[in-house]
Structure formats: C-alpha cells, structure tokens
C-alpha cells in the first residue's frame, strides 16, 4: 500500500509541475491578431535594397514610405471612442513615441529625404505621429484603422490603390497609419511601432524594397 501511495504521490507531483511550467511559459498577446491579406493577395516581393542605394533612391523621390505610428500606451484602447477626433478615448502615443516621431523627422531633414505629401489615418495617434515628425498631415480615409474581417476583405482596396499609384512629383509620400491595414494589403510580417516600409508603386500593384525601424534612418547615411 505504501508503494502504491508513493507512486500516486509522484504522479500528482509530476502533473502539478507540468501544469505550473505551462503557466509560467505562457505569454500574453501584446498585439491584436493581424488580419489575413485582402483577397489572399500580398505585395510583389522585391530584393531588399542596400542601405546606400536606398538613401540615394529616396533622395531622387518616387517612393511611398508607410509608417506604423510610433510607441503607444497599450493600457488604453479605442473601444469607447466616438469619433476620430475623440483623442481622450483612444490609445495615445507615449512620451517615448513622441520622441521617436520627432527623431524620425529630424533624420529625414538631416538626410535630405524630400517629401511632397504626408498622409495619415484620422486617428489621433497617427495624426500626432505625422505632425511631430513632419509638421503636417492630411487625413486619409484610405489609411484608416481596423481589421479586414471575413467577408470584408476589400476594406483596404483603396489603400492598395494608393500604394500602387506612382508619385508624380520629385519627392516621396509619407503615410502614418496602423499595423492592420498594412498587413491586410502586403502580408506578414507585422510592422513594429514606428517602423516603416519603403514602397515602390508599380501602377497596378506595389513592391516593398526595404523596412526601416524608427531608429534606423541615420544608419543609411553611415553606409553611403
């Protein structure tokens, strides 16, 4: 009987240890699950552009630079927001995010990367990112936030059209938006906060030539 009891005890202890290990190893989701790319499509793959070539190309113009807004306070969300201008009930930028946006703008000025237009999702965090970085922003309904839910995969068709349209003048277009719209039209991986995708419009589609973290812009000059 004692042997049976000891064996049962070992089994119970092993089960408890396995359960606890699973609980310790579990990690909470930090971001909302990204949607499936609209209509099963993603951007045309392109060979990554070398940093020196990227800076030279951006100085010539003709690219769209799609930013995800900089760092935000994830303890708040947009669930009670009544409108795009209802900033008190939306997830805001943190002080770190504001500093990141200013640094992005300073890097663009120092690197002499020309912008002919700055668009932004109407949400407060994206408008603030654009304003702090570049001093201007036009509200763009095409860059609005929200998932592409099943049966509504064409929600971001207007954004795909914007990213596919060639830039006509001698500069680049910056867009401050969100993670979900980008992954819906371009596919994985998800953009980090403050990260940008450099896009070459192709008329009927587009290709991504580079991804740059919020603190990676000045590195382009060091390789030029």
Segments and roles (model prediction):
Residues 2-15, 19:
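Bacterial N-terminal signal peptides that target proteins for export
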Residues 18-26:
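C-terminal segment of classical bacterial N-terminal signal peptides
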Residues 29-141, 146-150, 188-198, 202-207, ...:
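Active-site-proximal alpha-helix that buttresses catalytic centers in soluble enzyme cores
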Residues 62-64, 171-177:
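Generic beta-sheet signal
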Residues 143-152, 156-164:
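All-alpha RGS (Regulator of G-protein Signaling) helical domain and cognate RGS-like helical scaffolds
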Residues 158-169, 218-224:
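A polyampholytic, Gly/Pro-enriched intrinsically disordered region
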Residues 165-171, 201-204:
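A short, structured loop/turn motif at beta-sheet edges
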């Amino acid at each position: 009987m004692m042997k049976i009891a000891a064996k049962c005890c070992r089994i119970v202890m092993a089960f408890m240890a396995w359960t606890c290990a699973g609980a310790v190893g579990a990690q909470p989701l930090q971001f909302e699950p990204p949607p499936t790319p609209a209509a099963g499509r993603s951007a045309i793959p392109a060979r990554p552009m070398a940093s020196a070539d990227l800076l030279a190309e951006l100085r010539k113009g003709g690219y769209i630079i799609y930013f995800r807004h900089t760092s935000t306070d994830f303890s708040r969300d947009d669930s009670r927001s009544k409108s795009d201008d209802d900033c008190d009930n939306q997830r805001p930028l943190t002080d770190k995010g504001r500093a990141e946006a200013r640094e992005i703008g300073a890097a663009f000025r120092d690197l002499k990367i020309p912008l002919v237009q700055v668009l932004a999702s109407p949400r407060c965090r994206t408008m603030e990112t654009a304003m702090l970085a570049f001093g201007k922003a036009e509200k763009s309904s095409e860059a609005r936030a929200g998932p592409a839910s099943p049966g509504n995969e064409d929600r971001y068709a207007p954004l795909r059209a914007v990213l596919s349209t060639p830039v006509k003048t001698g500069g680049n277009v910056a867009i401050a938006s969100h993670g979900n719209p980008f992954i819906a039209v371009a596919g994985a991986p998800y953009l980090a906060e403050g990260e940008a995708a450099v896009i070459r419009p192709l008329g009927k589609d587009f290709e991504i030539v580079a991804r740059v973290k919020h603190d990676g812009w000045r590195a382009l000059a060091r390789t030029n």
